[in-house]
């Protein structure tokens, strides 16, 4: 299974999260009487100020989690830099079962759990852990897919070099397809969101936001399934290739 399908479904889930999670609205009280409306406005003003102060911690928690996950993730891909990758796994005591593919699958599961949790969480405090853990998924998505892509290109280039072929043009095409799949998913999600918002402008928008988040969770589960179908990179050692062709597996 190629990575581009998983990229597309992953960003279908991630796009609507990035578009809506920082813009959740309040309840609509336009049908209340004037006296009730003034009372509700007074309560909402004080409550909104308190919730905004608490809710502002959510982006901080999200970015902090993403930062620390990016730090502790093993640096380098297992194929192109097997020695450094093994050293990183040993240093951080990473279990061998946590391969690049499995870590990416787990990140999809965490994202889906967060999106589905938005159906029940209704407080500003609840959004802090709910969306803060998505920082893990974001950090993994910004790194692991490119490791897998690099490993696939490295494997192909090694085979082509052994056959005397040039893979330079093909590598550019593969990168272009992956970038296109990422951009296309975000465009599709934003068009869906804007279309529904226009059609439902007179209705309660909060319910539509929740359903969009649930849709993101469903897309994340689909991406998780496709991720499990990806082939694990083979552990090709530099030393073995260098003995055959020299210069770390690339002919001059």
Swiss-Prot record:
* One MF term in the entry's GO annotations: sucrose:proton symporter activity
| Residues annotated as glycosylated | 179
The job of this chain, per UniProt, is described as: MFS-type transporter; part of the gene cluster that mediates the biosynthesis of the mycotoxin cyclochlorotine, a hepatotoxic and carcinogenic cyclic chlorinated pentapeptide. Most likely responsible for cyclochlorotine secretion and thereby may contribute to intrinsic resistance.
Transmembrane among keywords: yes
How does this chain sit within the bilayer?
Multi-pass membrane protein
Q: Give the UniProt keywords, A-Z.
A: Glycoprotein, Membrane, Transmembrane, Transmembrane helix, Transport, Virulence
What parts of the sequence cross the membrane?
54-74, 116-136, 180-200, 208-228
Q: Which organism is it from?
A: Talaromyces islandicus (Penicillium islandicum)
Cellular compartments per GO CC: plasma membrane
Q: Where in the cell is it found?
A: Membrane
Q: Which domain of life is it from?
A: Eukaryota
List the pathway annotation.
Mycotoxin biosynthesis
UniProt keyword Membrane, yes or no: yes
Q: Effect of gene disruption?
A: Impairs the production of cyclochlorotine.
Q: State the family named in the UniProt similarity comment for this chain.
A: Belongs to the major facilitator superfamily.
Q: What is the lineage of its organism?
A: Eukaryota, Fungi, Dikarya, Ascomycota, Pezizomycotina
Q: What is this protein called?
A: MFS-type transporter cctQ
């Amino acid at each position: 299974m190629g990575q581009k399908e998983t990229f597309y479904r992953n960003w279908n889930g991630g796009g609507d999260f990035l578009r809506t999670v920082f813009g959740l609205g309040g309840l609509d009280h336009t049908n209340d009487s004037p006296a009730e409306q003034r009372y509700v406005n007074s309560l909402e003003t004080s409550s909104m100020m308190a919730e905004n102060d608490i809710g502002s911690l959510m982006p901080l928690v999200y970015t902090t989690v993403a930062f620390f996950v990016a730090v502790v993730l093993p640096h380098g891909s297992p194929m192109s830099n097997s020695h450094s990758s093994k050293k990183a796994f040993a240093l951080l005591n990473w279990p061998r079962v946590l391969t690049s593919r499995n870590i990416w699958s787990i990140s999809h599961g965490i994202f889906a759990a967060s999106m589905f949790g938005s159906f029940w969480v209704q407080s500003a405090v609840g959004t802090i852990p709910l969306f803060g853990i998505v920082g893990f998924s974001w950090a993994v998505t910004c790194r692991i897919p490119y490791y897998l892509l690099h490993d696939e290109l490295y494997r192909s280039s090694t085979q082509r070099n052994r056959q005397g072929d040039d893979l330079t043009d093909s590598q550019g095409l593969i990168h272009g397809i992956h970038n296109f799949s990422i951009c296309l998913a975000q465009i599709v999600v934003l068009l869906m969101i804007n279309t529904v918002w226009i059609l439902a402008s007179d209705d309660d928008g909060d319910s539509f936001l929740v359903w969009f988040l649930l849709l993101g969770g469903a897309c994340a589960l689909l991406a998780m399934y496709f991720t499990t179908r990806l082939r694990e990179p083979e552990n090709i050692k530099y030393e073995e290739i260098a003995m055959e062709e020299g210069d770390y597996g690339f002919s001059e």
